[in-house]
Amino acid sequence: MSVNDSTHIKTRFAPSPTGYLHVGGARTALFNYLFAKKFGGTFLLRIEDTDPERSKPEYSEQILISMKWLGLDWDEGPYHQSERMHIYQQYTQKLLEEGKAYRCFCTTEELEQMREQQRQQGLPTRYDGRCSRLTQEEIEERLNKGMPFAVRLKVPQDRGIIAWDDMVKGHIEINSSELDDFILVRSDGTPTYNFAVVIDDHTMGVTHVLRGEDHIPNTPKQILIYEALGWETPEFGHVPMILGKDKTKLSKRHGAVGVEAYRDEGFLPEALFNFLALLGASYDPDREVYTKQELIDLFDPKKIGLHPAVFDPDKLYYINREHMKMLPPEELLDRIRPFAEAKGFQIEPYHLRLIPLLVERMRTLKDFVELADYIFTDDFTVDEKAQELLAKDLPLGGLAEQLDATVWDADHIEAVLRQYAQDKGIKPRDYFPFIRAVISGKSVGPSLFHLMEAMPKDMVLRRLRKS
């Protein structure tokens, strides 16, 4: 199945609710979202929660929250596999009746004994198909005894090469002789991943599946299930894994790996969306900042690389800053608000004047509060170098009165400060850093005169008089 005018594209993201939404899963969801949107298709969300031991409702909720925050709005769902058990049972029965699957009554001990014998003989460990040779009478006898059973797919002996043209990796083929009669339904009645996902994807009309390359071993099994059920297979595409900068698999030791952690650290969803869309994909080597619509228009599975993608935090910080600069100052300040309130600070209208001065120095929304704590409170932090500047104890007497009498803009403030320094016999390069330390507790920052203009006049004068 390929993309053409008559195909209604439907992609899906199907996470297991066993934890937070990992950035790797978020990237998979994002690729499927972009693919569907590019072709006017449908993006479906399915929660694969058939494992009651590990699946938690709170994780499901957190995944939905993270996806919404990231801008991955689904068109259909969320469906829950746990509510579809009757559908899996229906297709299990169909395969049993058609002789394409069979009940396996082997115990764990019998299977381990089988594998041990194979190991001793130097053979690959695999199921030997013994239960496929049971007579109907033997099956009935075991059922009447209430013996538990799994259900296995009867892999055709003459199937030969299983091949598909991967949307990302190109032609892939595997010999069916490498596969044994694998389990479709466990002895507790729950479907295996491969069985449930095939039934779900087909009955939900999924046409294209983009997922991690760790699913490549699952693909031939799924193709065999599609064939057993007489269904057309969707298009498959397998994307490379994500590595940390040290070229090992991305994990907590590389920093945050959950989407909600990036939200809480002050990254814009637009920026993380942009970053993840380029993680392993390349469009223009000279450009890294895109809007969502541009990424939708550009998306092409063939542009996804064959090698693992490296998660570069510095690149994410850069993209985040650029997206902050793209926002109107009013909207950026509104995005900053929760981070200020978390520190017990209130956003005031005059803070808007600080945005153009500070945005170039910000990497995240949190940074506004860290860089400019002095606009929220007189109890601001004083950095080490500013403490050294303050220790010089340069004169301030009468300065507040001179500033109070002038027009409150950068040019007039600069003129007053220069004249004052000259009158006191102090070089401006020595005096201006001292003034910055007095009013902000910082040794570096935006233009001193523009900073003073942006700050409330009474706040600046109060601090000059107090010091």
Curated annotation (Swiss-Prot):
Set out the biological process GO terms recorded for this chain's protein: glutamyl-tRNA aminoacylation
Q: Where is this motif: 'HIGH' region?
A: 15-25
Domain of life of the source = Bacteria
Any single Gene Ontology cellular-component annotation? cytosol
Q: Known EC number(s)?
A: 6.1.1.17
Q: Which InterPro entries match?
A: aa-tRNA-synth_I_cd-bd, aa-tRNA-synth_I_codon-bd_sub2, aa-tRNA-synth_I_CS, aa_tRNA-synth_I_cd-bd_sf, Glu-tRNA-ligase_bac/mito, Glu/Gln-tRNA-synth, Glu/Gln-tRNA-synth_Ib_cat-dom, GluQ/Sye
Q: Which GO terms describe its molecular function?
A: ATP binding; glutamate-tRNA ligase activity; tRNA binding; zinc ion binding
Stored Pfam families: Anticodon_2, tRNA-synt_1c
Role summary: Catalyzes the attachment of glutamate to tRNA(Glu) in a two-step reaction: glutamate is first activated by ATP to form Glu-AMP and then transferred to the acceptor end of tRNA(Glu).
NCBIfam families, alphabetically?
Answer: gltX_bact, PRK05710.1-4
Q: What protein family does this chain belong to?
A: Belongs to the class-I aminoacyl-tRNA synthetase family. Glutamate--tRNA ligase type 1 subfamily.
Q: What protein name does the entry list?
A: Glutamate--tRNA ligase
